[in-house]
């Protein structure tokens, strides 16, 4: 056994040396022969905790058994790993090639990913198309304002193309000057309150604000809290205003309530907005009367939107100037608190219209017909006939047209008046399905109650030219029954305008 032991030990040492030489880690070289090296190995074995070596440190049998089992395990493990080593050796060149080709594969992978991304872009764009369409539909408010301004420009051009425009312009120049002088507040009329606090100026509504219905207007009535004193306040207010303004108790009550609103900031702006809506209300009431005549209404709808836009805004300003005049006088003198000033007519700084109303014996003209001419139809001709002259400050300022007659086209194809004379004095607005047509809560015409005859349209006519007529929102006084004043500009004066228009739905819902 000892011989075998030494042989195995020598083989083990030689094998270890060869393996170490291949791995570039040579073992320590002994200067003695193989036995010396074997002894060195054997002496180190007892120090290990091997099985059977605890009983005797020099027990060679135990040492041999331990070495044999150790070597057997090593051989078995080596044999088991030989196939794996062979496979690794075979696949090593392939692995080297794979490493060399790895950059190319990465490049191909990157190109493939890029191609997939480029293919997916059209799909993403297709998905985003509806969002872009929705964004395009949301037009900014500035663009809408520009469109409304363009409507106003087109309206002016459209009216300028009509053949009767020159005649209408010449017939209304003097009347417009008189209207402005008579109704617009000025510095001379501001006695108690500074003129800067008055409400004045022209207004214009956008086309969108004209597209409202007729069903949201309730009748205006005298408020319950004003019923006891309305006669006194209305009488004092009527004395302060010109007779031709024909202030009604309902209008007096509404102006009275406006000044009682608890508004500390921007009261002037809010009051102006309310006056504009009141004026628009009167225009819409007139249009509702026009709608009753189907033939005339169909002709009105055929007018282009720009022309109707200009007509409605002109009528709006006529009503608005009257409301402004009444508001400024009521707010300045407060007849509900102070009554009538004792110096009315005696003070040189008092309103010229007030002095005229007290001292002048000249008949006052109707507020929406402040013109000194009227249309007289004879046969197929409509001529301007001279009427009485109207003075505003003594006999210095006159507002009358020259006596020269202006001939117009034949009225054979003229339309009937848009608002026919009413036979009864009660023309109140129905109160069923009452809804407010306006957004602002301060502009609501409340409190309103049914049964008030606030709209009277006797002998009132509407001009499609819109340059000098309006809807009259009250009854004409009996003093003028014998000398009925007709509107100076009627539909009969514009036959060619109706011929040149195109069909369309017009302003909705009109």
Swiss-Prot record:
Residues 1-20 form the signal peptide. Residues 122-137 have a biased composition (Basic residues). Its main location: secreted. GO terms for cellular component: extracellular region; host cell nucleus. Residues 429-442 have a biased composition (Basic and acidic residues). Residues 393-405 have a biased composition (Polar residues). It comes from the Eukaryota. Glycans are attached at residue 47. A motif (RxLR-dEER) lies at residues 48-65. Residues 111-139, 386-442 are annotated as: Disordered. It is found in: Secreted; Host nucleus. Keywords: Glycoprotein, Host nucleus, Secreted, Signal, Virulence. The keyword Signal applies. Belongs to the RxLR effector family. Secreted effector that completely suppresses the host cell death induced by cell death-inducing proteins. The RxLR-dEER motif acts to carry the protein into the host cell cytoplasm through binding to cell surface phosphatidylinositol-3-phosphate. This is Secreted RxLR effector protein 108. It comes from Plasmopara viticola. The lineage of its organism: Eukaryota, Sar, Stramenopiles, Oomycota, Peronosporales.
């Amino acid at each position: 056994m000892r011989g075998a032991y030494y042989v195995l030990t020598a083989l083990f040492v030689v094998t270890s040396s060869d393996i170490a030489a291949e791995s570039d880690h040579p073992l320590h070289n002994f200067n003695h022969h193989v036995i010396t090296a074997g002894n060195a190995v054997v002496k180190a074995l007892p120090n290990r905790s091997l099985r059977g070596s605890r009983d005797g440190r020099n027990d060679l049998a135990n040492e041999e058994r331990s070495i044999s089992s150790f070597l057997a395990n090593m051989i078995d493990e080596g044999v088991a790993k030989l196939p794996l080593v062979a496979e690794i050796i075979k696949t090593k060149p392939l692995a080297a090639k794979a490493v060399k080709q790895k950059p190319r594969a990465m490049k191909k992978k990157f190109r493939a990913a890029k191609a997939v991304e480029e293919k997916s872009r059209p799909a993403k764009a297709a998905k985003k198309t509806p969002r872009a369409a929705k964004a395009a539909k949301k037009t900014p408010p500035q663009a809408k304002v520009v469109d409304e301004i363009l409507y106003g420009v087109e309206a002016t051009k459209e009216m300028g193309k009509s053949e009767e425009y020159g005649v209408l312009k010449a017939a209304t120049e003097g009347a417009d000057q008189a209207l402005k002088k008579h109704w617009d507040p000025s510095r001379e009329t501001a006695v108690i309150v500074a003129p800067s606090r008055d409400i004045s100026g022209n207004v214009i509504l956008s086309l969108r604000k004209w597209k409202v219905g007729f069903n949201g207007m309730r009748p205006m009535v005298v408020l319950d809290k004003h019923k006891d004193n309305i006669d006194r306040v209305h009488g004092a207010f009527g004395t302060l205003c010109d007779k031709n303004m024909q202030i009604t108790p309902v209008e007096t009550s509404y102006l009275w309530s406006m000044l009682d609103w608890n508004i500390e900031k921007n009261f002037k702006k809010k009051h102006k907005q309310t006056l504009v809506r009141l004026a628009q209300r009167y225009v819409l009431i007139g249009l509702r009367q026009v709608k009753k005549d189907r033939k005339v209404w169909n002709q009105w709808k055929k007018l282009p939107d720009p022309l109707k836009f200009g007509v409605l805004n002109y009528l709006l300003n006529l009503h608005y100037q009257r409301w402004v005049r009444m508001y400024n006088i009521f707010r300045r003198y407060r007849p509900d608190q102070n009554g009538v000033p004792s110096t009315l007519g005696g003070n040189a700084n008092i309103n010229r219209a007030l002095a005229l109303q007290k001292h002048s014996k000249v008949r006052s003209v109707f507020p929406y017909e402040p013109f000194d001419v009227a249309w007289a139809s004879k046969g197929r001709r409509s001529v301007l006939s001279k009427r009485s002259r109207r003075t505003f400050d003594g006999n210095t300022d006159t507002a009358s047209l020259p006596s020269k007659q202006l001939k117009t086209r034949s009225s054979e194809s003229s339309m009937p008046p848009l608002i026919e004379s009413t036979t009864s004095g009660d023309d109140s607005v129905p109160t069923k399905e009452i809804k407010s047509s306006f957004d602002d809560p301060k502009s609501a015409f409340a409190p309103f109650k049914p049964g008030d005859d606030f709209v009277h349209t006797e002998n009132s006519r509407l001009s499609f030219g819109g340059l000098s007529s309006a809807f009259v929102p009250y009854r004409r006084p009996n003093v003028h029954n014998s000398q009925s004043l007709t509107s100076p500009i009627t539909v009969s004066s514009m036959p060619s305008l109706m011929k040149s228009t195109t069909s369309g739905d017009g302003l909705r819902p009109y």
